[in-house]
Amino acid sequence: MSAALRNYHARMQRVLDHIDRHLDDDLDLETVSGIAAFSKFHFHRQFTATFGLSVHRYVQLARMKRASYRLAYRDTQSVTEVAMDAGYDAPDAFARAFRQRFGQSPSSFRKAPDWEPWLAAFGPLEEARNKLMQRTFTADDVAIRNVPSMRVAIMEHRGDPATLGATVQRFIAWRKSAGLHPRTNPTFNVWRSERRPASPVDYSVDLCVGTDKPIEANGEQIRVGEIPGGRCAVLRVIGNTDNLEVPALYLYHTGLPSSGEEARDFPLYCQRLAFFPEVPEHEAIAELFLPLK
């Protein structure tokens, strides 16, 4: 890649970062073109040529994604407040747009989200982000740590990854009822299958929260387990952490062979340290742990 193209991409990346940080602000063409230091007369076409979406469409999808996360996973805001934060002047307009995109009203989505239309609706946003957000890693990004064992409460997800959102929603509701807040009790995902198994029903991941308290299931299927201590190769990922396959493959393809280390008999897992939508999506943080012998 030429220096000129790297500079061009960096200017476009500044725009995406600004949008993520300022979803509550007026993100008109003049504002966002100024962030990249491009002419407003050309920027709309430059943005579309780079990302495959117009600026307006990109902002609309980013706001709607945050709104849908708040509806499904957070209950501190009313539907009206979520609508206003998404840039709508009236709840009815938000409800119409939401139903058109996801086939559900906001209230219905909050109670029982249908995740397949949701995943399809945000495909263009994820594709746009991936144009410039392909992260590259080096050996210096990987640290070897001695990790202590961690007692965890586990909610298992077994089955199609398209329904994972429903399990996450139940997990969040359960940990809240159990008083296990993310600020005081660490959050882990343990992957027990590949990301895209040949049959979707074979997908398997454990949603975990660290705790030394007695576990109250509160009507959910919760079991107690342990993430074993030991040496781990650790890779920190900052940004969109919905899909951690690229950094995971870096650990296996480059980090593991070049180090001479061997993987231990426990699955790859991650700890989630900063969560969207509490932070802008590009500021979310997760750490991948590859257990070593």
How would you describe each model-predicted region?
Residues Y8, A36, G87, L164, ...:
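Charged, low-complexity surface patches
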Residues A3-L5, R14-V15, E30, L53-V55, ...:
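Short, flexible segments with low predicted structural confidence
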Residues Q46, R57, K65, Y69-Y73, ...:
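A solvent-exposed interaction/effector surface
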Residues V15-D17, S39, P186:
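Intrinsic disorder/low-complexity signature
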Residues S2-L27, Q60-Q77:
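A short, Lys/Arg-enriched amphipathic alpha-helix from helix-turn-helix/homeodomain DNA-binding modules
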Residues D17-D20, A37, I172, K176:
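Short amphipathic alpha-helical segments enriched in leucine
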Residues M1-A3, D26-V59, A83-S105:
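Basic/polar phosphate-binding segments, predominantly the helix-turn-helix DNA-binding elements
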